[in-house]
Amino acid sequence: PQARWIRAIAMARVSSSQIVVQARTWLGTRYHHQGRLKKSAAGPGGVDCIGLIVGVADELGLQDGAGNPLSRADETDYSMYPERGRLVGCIEKYLRPIPLDKMSEGDVLLFRTFKDPQHVALLSIYPTGGLGLIHCNSSAGRVVEQPLSDTWRRMLTHAYRFKNKQLQSLK
């Protein structure tokens, strides 16, 4: 009982702006399919778009409904090309779908770059104004932040938000 009480006191709420601040620490990390390693003084790291979301959630101590790190559910056996419904199914197990007109800073966005949705990004408030994306862009070869352009908006298919329980962190 005492351990549970101590654990409850140690929890802190993670805000949407903290999610974005943490994601920005990944800027410049190189692209690597299925990678999960943030850049550091030791090297450039390597991450893909899903790895960025998993890494940020892990660094912030975000949990699933049972109190396990969200990264525990991470999968790295996926193709570079969409597998019908797999990504949407995995995301919807852990994140709450929200209407596109309700998306806000810190939300996870899903894009269709080919036939099926296959790319994720975090929504930010872009430093020069307007909405932005923080994502691992394979074309850029690294994690970048860029404006949410009309091109990206046309490819946007879904928006998700971390559930309130997940925003309780043990860190």
Region spans (language model):
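N-terminal capping segments
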Residues: 9-96, 100, 105, 112-114, ...
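Bulky hydrophobic/aromatic packing residues
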Residues: 78, 109, 152-156
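Residues that flank catalytic or metal-binding motifs in active/ligand-binding sites
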Residues: 105, 129, 155
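Short, Lys/Arg-rich amphipathic alpha-helical interaction segments
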Residues: 118, 138-164
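Catalytic Cys-His active-site segments of thiol-dependent hydrolases/isopeptidases
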Residues: 122-145
